Structures are given as structure tokens and as C-alpha cells.
Curated annotation (Swiss-Prot), chain A:
Example of a GO cellular component annotation carried by this entry: eukaryotic 43S preinitiation complex
Domain of life, source organism: Eukaryota
One GO BP annotation of this record: formation of cytoplasmic translation initiation complex
InterPro entries, A to Z: eIF3h, eIF3h_C, JAMM/MPN+_dom, JAMM_MPN+_peptidase_M67A, MPN
Subunit organization: Component of the eukaryotic translation initiation factor 3 (eIF-3) complex. The eIF-3 complex interacts with pix. Interacts with mxt.
Record protein name field: Eukaryotic translation initiation factor 3 subunit H
Alphabetical list of CDD domains matching this protein: MPN_eIF3h (cd08065)
Keyword terms: Cytoplasm, Initiation factor, Protein biosynthesis
Organism: Drosophila willistoni
Entry-linked Pfam families: eIF3h_C, JAB
Gene name linked to the record: eIF-3p40
Boundaries of every MPN domain copy: 21-153
Keyword presence, Cytoplasm: yes
Swiss-Prot record, chain B:
GO molecular function terms listed in the Swiss-Prot or TrEMBL record: metallopeptidase activity; translation initiation factor activity; translation initiation factor binding
GO CC terms in record: eukaryotic 43S preinitiation complex; eukaryotic 48S preinitiation complex; eukaryotic translation initiation factor 3 complex, eIF3m
Quaternary assembly: Component of the eukaryotic translation initiation factor 3 (eIF-3) complex. The eIF-3 complex interacts with pix.
Domain of life according to the entry: Eukaryota
PANTHER family per record: EUKARYOTIC TRANSLATION INITIATION FACTOR 3 SUBUNIT F, EUKARYOTIC TRANSLATION INITIATION FACTOR 3 SUBUNIT F-RELATED
UniProt cross-references to Pfam families, sorted A to Z: JAB, MitMem_reg
Record's protein name: Eukaryotic translation initiation factor 3 subunit F-2
Function: Component of the eukaryotic translation initiation factor 3 (eIF-3) complex, which is involved in protein synthesis of a specialized repertoire of mRNAs and, together with other initiation factors, stimulates binding of mRNA and methionyl-tRNAi to the 40S ribosome. The eIF-3 complex specifically targets and initiates translation of a subset of mRNAs involved in cell proliferation.
Domain MPN: 11-147
Compartments, as annotated in UniProt: Cytoplasm
Length: 337, 286
């Protein structure tokens, strides 16, 4: 119960900055275009988000892509500044409110993402990272997620202390590294008018491929990456266990040495000789470095999202299967007649 | 020139461009009545058609009732070069403007873009943002030279056929926005969970089936004159459901359901494990 209360207090803390993200259709479409174009080249797409903060809502009104990372000659900061300055002249919001990245399921919440987001959030407090899942979206489910680091995660990264104690003191767990912020897509009335015009022009059958029944390959992919992550976590667990064993062994040795010393000291005092202080002995046993918990925590977070995705995916697949069943039943009933 | 456009039978327009133009229009400077900008495009590798895939807004100053227009050309060049860095395959193919009709400055702009365009044949996209006739008109023009040979010549902007193009992922996003535009509900713009999406589409399907059913019943009751095309289309739809024999369908169905349930169980178990392991590690030293 205490844990739950603690988490509640934590969400309130994050709410102080931003409650939800409101994304313009234009920015969504730009991200979709960029991410899919890069995913055709098997590249990771990244870009900057532009917008403004109104009360507790972060509005993303525009975005622009970062150039391909292969080009080393270019100054990325310079590029960003130039683009923003240019866009400002046509009255685009020029507040840099975060960045976006294409990714496939679950793997997005990586150490690299944590690092970049840390730098963003320390320089611009309100910034978010938007993760766009290309795989899922090309199967018919628009998948945009906005994340922010929780205040504890920032504190932890700032301290650079990844020991289990530090994690415990800050109450950081795999669920409280990143906070997901709900995204809302909103268009201006004029855009909505245009959308209803488009309604007549666009083919009806596009974009409904999420009713596809071929689920085995998708599930297989999910499972494969889940297994990889679990393996990683296992490695981390093994490392931690080893550490615990070593510490335990050291402890027993220390106790033995101390007991020996106490006995010797007792003999010495009875003989009236000066005693040897315990510190001498303790010094011989250097404390073991504690393995960092950061990787394990991040991997746990990834596994958690994978598991969530799988559960979601399966539930909708089951729904589709039952739809097909009723179709089949109707067909069979007709045959019998 | 004209022959070229005939070969290029279809021009595809990405919805992103329209969204961009409307955004630009809404953000225009106070004293401006219209926005103009450069259209960028490329050849769609799948269909071979020319596709208008991107655009950027230009800084300009227009003078009503004259054909004079001042455009910041330096800005246009800079924007094009910046775009080249991220989308190197996109080339200048024309310009867009908002307004009721082709403006008087179009001839001047045409001259400029004819120089910038790779094939010397720029296109002009016109969007009526003033919503005349309760519609938002979108038209694509190309300028055709007309006049007397060796005599006075002029430019005529003639219409080009244009079609909306959107890849699958774009349609997914568009569908969602369309739904919001057409039926504003309380949860505006929320990205729905997958299961809800499937439920929604099932409901859609049901209403469509009801519609068809009503039509069929009315036709059978001689209340409606039968229509052969509709009948054939219905027949096609009915026969498109493949008949799988009961045995193999059961097999497939059961295997799939088993897989799914198994996966859900596994996923839940892993989640529980994670929780436990974290709690154990976070346990204070005794």
C-alpha cells in the first residue's frame, strides 16, 4: 500500500510540468512520412518537435527531421538553428519542445533514449520524446507515444549513482523511469474541413489492414525480442548474484578474522600487552564495487512494455479470430441448408 | 510540352502537402491575404507517377490589383537546400497558392519556377481557403503557351487531373483524424487502443450489413427496383468469403487461440516476475 501511495505522489510531481501532449495533424503526418521513409532504408529517423506550452498542455504544432546521421561533416546544432530560424520567419512556433524517434516495439526505451531525453529535459524543462512505432503503424494501428523522464530518474542520472541503494532511496523502478504522457491529436477547424473534403477523394479500403488475420509472424517477432530482453536481464541477474556471493564470502572471512582478533586481543590484555585495533583487519577487506542497476532497470522496463504489447496484440487478435468464426459458422449453416 | 503531360497521366498529391498549406495559411502574417510556397515532388517508385510529396512556405509580398509580387528568393533557396539534406530525392516541381482563382502574379511566378524546375514545366496548386460555395476547392494547373505563332503569346493555366495518394501508414493516421473531424466525440483525438479499434470497425461493419440487409429485403419485397450492378457487387462480396472446410477451420482456430492465450499467460507471468525481482532487490538490508 505504501508503495502505491508513493507512486501516486510521484505522478503528481510529473503532472506539475505537463498533463498531456496535443499534437497537430501536420506534425503527425510529417513524423509518419519521415519515419516510414527512413525505415525503408532501415535507418532510425529522428527529428525535432516544435510547439508551445499552454498551461499544462504541450502543443506540438510542427516538426522537422534531422539529416541522416551518416553525414559527419555537418554541424547538427547549426542545422537545427538554421531550420528553426527559417521556420520562425513564416510564423511557425519556434520553441523546441522535444524530439521524435522511430522505433519498433518496446526497444525504444533504451539507455540512449534516456541519455538524450535527460539532456533535453535539463535544458528545456517541458520537452518530451515522441516514439513512433513504424511496424505497428504499417499494420494499421497508429502508435505514437510520448514519454518524459520522471523527476526521480533525472535526479538519479544527475547523481550518476546507479547502486541499488540509490535506486531505493529515490524510489526509482523500471516503471518509474519514464512517464508516458497521453497524446491527443487535434486539428484546426479549417483542417477538419479539408479532412472531410479528403474523405471523398481518398480510397475507402486503405488503412484498414489491421483486420489482417495473419498474426503468427508478428507474434513471433514480439516473442523473439522479448526472449532477447529476458536473456539480457538474466545476464544482469547472474552478475548481481555473483556479487552477492562474493560479498557473502568476504563477510564470513571478515567475521572469522575479527573473531580471531578478538581472541588474540583477549590473550594480549591478559598479558598486559597493547591491543591491535579492529580497523587494521577491516582494512584488509576492501568493499566490493556494487554492480550498477541501471541496465537491469532499463531492460526490465523494455520487457514490461514488450509484455504489454503482446497482451494487447493477443487480445485484439482473439477478437478478430472470433469475428472470423462467426463468418465461418454462418457459411457452414448455409451449406447445411 | 503538352505531350509530356499526357504521358504523365496521373499526378498524385500527398495529404501532408494540404495539411501544410492550411497550417501556413492559418499562420500567415496579419497583412497577408494569401500564402504561396514551393511544391516539392518526386517520381513514386511504385506506380511511376509523379508525386507531390512536400512543400515549404515562402516569404512574399503581394500587391493587389497588379501582377507584381516580391518573393524572398534567398529564403526559397535556403529552404530548398535544407530540405535536400533530409529528403535528397525531392525536387522543385511547382508552387502553391491560396485564393479563389489563379492570381495575376501567377505569370511571374511561373517564369521563376520554370527556371527552378528540372523539366521547365512547373505545376500550380491552388487551394481555396475562403471556402466559396461551402467547399474547399483544390485544383492543379499547368501553364500552356497559347497565341499566334510568331505573334503575341500568352499563358493559359489549364487544369490537370490530380489524385490523392497516401501510403498505408499515412492512411492509418488520416483515418484516425478523419474520424475526429466527422464525429467529434468527447475523447477527441485520443489514440485508441488496438482492441477498441477492432471493436469500432466491427460496429461499422454491422451498420453496413444492416444497410445491405435492408436493401435486399426491400428489393425482395418489390419496394425498390432491382439494380443489377448492386446485385453483382453483393454477389462478389458474398463469394469472396473463402469456404474453409469445418475441420481445418477448427484446427486453425484452435491453434491460434491456444497460441494467443499462451502468449498472454507468458506475458503476464513475466510481468509478475519483474515486479517480484525488483521488490527483492529494493528490499532494505536487514
Amino acid at each position: 500500500m505504501a508503495n502505491r501511495g508513493g507512486r501516486h505522489a510521484r505522478t503528481e510531481e510529473t503532472e506539475n510540468a505537463i498533463n498531456y501532449v496535443q499534437c497537430d495533424g501536420l506534425a503527425v503526418m510529417k513524423m509518419v512520412k519521415h519515419c516510414h521513409e527512413e525505415s525503408n532504408n532501415m535507418d532510425l529517423a529522428q527529428g525535432a518537435l516544435l510547439g508551445l506550452v499552454v498551461d499544462k498542455c504541450l502543443e506540438i504544432t510542427n516538426c522537422f527531421p534531422f539529416p541522416k546521421s551518416g553525414d559527419e561533416t555537418m554541424d547538427e546544432e547549426m542545422y537545427q538553428l538554421t531550420v528553426m530560424r527559417r521556420l520562425r520567419r513564416v510564423n511557425v512556433d519556434h520553441l523546441h519542445v522535444g524530439w521524435y524517434q522511430s522505433s519498433d516495439v518496446g526497444n525504444s526505451l533504451s539507455l540512449a533514449l534516456l541519455e538524450s531525453q535527460y539532456h533535453y529535459q535539463t535544458s528545456i524543462e517541458e520537452s518530451v520524446v515522441v516514439v513512433y512505432d513504424t511496424q505497428k503503424s504499417s499494420r494499421g494501428f497508429l502508435c505514437l507515444k510520448a514519454y518524459r523522464l520522471t523527476p526521480q530518474a533525472i535526479q538519479m542520472y544527475k547523481d550518476g549513482d546507479f547502486t541499488p541503494e540509490a535506486f531505493r532511496n529515490l524510489k526509482v523502478g523500471y516503471e518509474s523511469l519514464f512517464a508516458e504522457i497521453p497524446i491527443v491529436i487535434k486539428n484546426s477547424p479549417l483542417t477538419n474541413i479539408m479532412m472531410s473534403e479528403l474523405n471523398e477523394l481518398l480510397p475507402e479500403d486503405k488503412g484498414h489492414n489491421f483486420l489482417d488475420l495473419g498474426t503468427a509472424s508478428v507474434l513471433e517477432n514480439h516473442m523473439r525480442s522479448l526472449i532477447e530482453r529476458v536473456d539480457e536481464l538474466y545476464q544482469e541477474a547472474v552478475r548481481y548474484n555473483k556479487y552477492q556471493q562474493v560479498v557473502f564470502k568476504q563477510d564470513t572471512e571478515k567475521h572469522r578474522a575479527l573473531a580471531k582478533l578478538a581472541a588474540e586481543n583477549a590473550v594480549r590484555t591478559s598479558k598486559g600487552e597493547p591491543t591491535v585495533s579492529e580497523e587494521e583487519v577491516i582494512k584488509q577487506f576492501r568493499p566490493m564495487p556494487v554492480p550498477a542497476r541501471l541496465t537491469a532497470t532499463i531492460t526490465s522496463g523494455q520487457i514490461n512494455t514488450h509484455a504489454q504489447h503482446i497482451a494487447q496484440f493477443c487480445s485484439q487478435s482473439l477478437a478478430k479470430l472470433f469475428i472470423t468464426e462467426s463468418l465461418q459458422n454462418a457459411k457452414e449453416a448455409k451449406e447445411i441448408k | 510540352m503538352q505531350a509530356e503531360f499526357k504521358l504523365r497521366s496521373k499526378i498524385l498529391l500527398q495529404p501532408l502537402v494540404l495539411l501544410h498549406i492550411i497550417d501556413a495559411y492559418e499562420r500567415r502574417p496579419k497583412d497577408c491575404t494569401q500564402v504561396i510556397g514551393t511544391l516539392l515532388g518526386r517520381n513514386n517508385p511504385e506506380s511511376g507517377h509523379l508525386e507531390i510529396s512536400n512543400c515549404f512556405t515562402l516569404l512574399h509580398k503581394d500587391y493587389p490589383n497588379s501582377d507584381r509580387i516580391d518573393v524572398d528568393l534567398q529564403y526559397a533557396n535556403d529552404m530548398y537546400e535544407l530540405n535536400q539534406l533530409t529528403y535528397p530525392q525531392e525536387k522543385i516541381i511547382g508552387w502553391y497558392a491560396t485564393g479563389k482563382e489563379v492570381s495575376r502574379s501567377a505569370v511571374n511566378l511561373h517564369e521563376y519556377y520554370a527556371r527552378e524546375c528540372a523539366d521547365g514545366n512547373p505545376m500550380h496548386l491552388l487551394i481555396d481557403t475562403s471556402l466559396r460555395g461551402q467547399r474547399m476547392m483544390m485544383r492543379l494547373y499547368t501553364a500552356v503557351v497559347m497565341g499566334v505563332p510568331n505573334g503575341t503569346k500568352g499563358l493559359m493555366f489549364s487544369l490537370l487531373p490530380v489524385e490523392m495518394s497516401s501510403g498505408n501508414p499515412e492512411s492509418v493516421a488520416l483515418n484516425l483524424m478523419k474520424k475526429n473531424a466527422l464525429q467529434p466525440t468527447k475523447q477527441v483525438g485520443r489514440i485508441l487502443p488496438e482492441l477498441v479499434q477492432v471493436v469500432d470497425i466491427t460496429r461499422d461493419l454491422q451498420t453496413k450489413l444492416d444497410l445491405v440487409l435492408r436493401y435486399v429485403n426491400e428489393t425482395l419485397a418489390r419496394k425498390r427496383t432491382p439494380n443489377n450492378t448492386v446485385g453483382r457487387a453483393l454477389h462478389d462480396a458474398l463469394t469472396s468469403v473463402p469456404l474453409v472446410d469445418a475441420e481445418s477451420f477448427r484446427m486453425m482456430f484452435n491453434a491460434n487461440v491456444r497460441d494467443m492465450l499462451m502468449s498472454i499467460t507468458l506475458a503476464t507471468m513475466i510481468k509478475a516476475q519483474l515486479k517480484i525481482s525488483e521488490s527483492v532487490i529494493a528490499m532494505p538490508d536487514l
